[in-house]
């Protein structure tokens, strides 16, 4: 049965320790009615404090689900790759202390910085080698590792699918962000259909859209890979076909968590309950 989740990232500046802070966000997520919560890197995501996240989740009665971290495995130098793999493994240790069952790590920040052979296929062997070693290590700690469709370079459905198959490890799958395919100018529901068999975790996100031929709309908008304009929206408020994508995942047999990752400009204390209500409605379609 699919359960609801929210990313600490969705709380924006409220997750700062001068505001609600990480532990306060955990309480607020539970008050809003989410089944689970996931985390981005913060002041508590280290070996000294990670256990406090687990303890707070147990105290309020919400499940710690996932930990999202940065990473760059597109490194040709073997020593550099080895160093980055070691660093990400150390974050797997942190994830274990947090009590989460999944870890999403970035795989690349872009193509090789040279004038030839710079494409995704050139970087893929290095990324796959590193991701495979991390997946193997995390399996021993009971943590599933994932790649997410974000960051432009590894964002298209076919690229992400190619990466997962290149890694070829049972402990490595996809965090499918249903809105992020728009950043690569793809049709979200079609791309979700490609990625559904690999889904280990899901981010629910939506965007407003303006064609790149128009004038820049202003603050809060950013460019897709081909120059269209996007702005974060509540689930169902944008044009990202959120309901259809959720239905595709539901019909595929996915039964994990669906996590709200809100990037809009509205007040989060209003936006997140609204997003949760829409997610629950869409799951019933």
Name what the model sees in each region.
Residues 6, 29, 37, 57, ...:
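Conserved, mostly hydrophobic/aromatic
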Residues 269-285:
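C-terminal helical cap(s) of enzyme catalytic domains, especially alpha/beta-barrels
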Residues 21-42, 98-99:
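Catalytic domains of carbohydrate-active enzymes, especially glycoside hydrolases
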Residues 15-29, 82-93, 184-192, 242-245:
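Short, acidic/polar
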Residues 36-37, 67, 132-239, 281:
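Acidic/histidine-rich catalytic cores of soluble enzymes
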Residues 13-18, 39-50, 72-82, 111-115, ...:
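Acidic-and-aromatic substrate-binding clefts and catalytic sites of carbohydrate-active enzymes
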Residues 55-63, 78-174, 183, 243:
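Active-site acidic/histidine proton-transfer and metal-coordination neighborhood
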Residues 1-19:
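Boundary/entry segment of secreted carbohydrate-active catalytic domains
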